[in-house]
UniProtKB/Swiss-Prot annotation:
This is Large ribosomal subunit protein uL18. GO terms for molecular function: 5S rRNA binding; structural constituent of ribosome. It comes from Pectobacterium atrosepticum (strain SCRI 1043 / ATCC BAA-672) (Erwinia carotovora subsp. atroseptica). The gene is rplR. The keyword Magnesium does not apply. The keyword DNA repair does not apply.
Amino acid sequence: MDKKAARIRRATRARRKLQELGATRLVVHRTPRHIYAQVIAPNGSEVLVAASTVEKAIAEQLKSTGNKDAATAIGKAIAERALEKGIKNVSFDRSGFQYHGRVQALADAAREAGLQF
């Protein structure tokens, strides 16, 4: 089993558990160059809010789109957008990535901005 397959296996297991709970999920995906965050409805078929470093408005404010500063900016942005839509409580779905570095920075920034998980 290669590294990507192991990550996907971890992500699938966590998503199944969150689906059983019927929770609204804050999903994080990262690549070496960008980081993405989405708030997904409990049924899993609808993206309620999204933010990523691909967005021109956010990318222009950042020196680099693939570091902790970028992850912090995305965490704040996703929290602000979720709160505008009335979403306060979410379950954090790290997509099988380690809770470290950019993933942790995004989560911490979202918590500081008012999301609860």
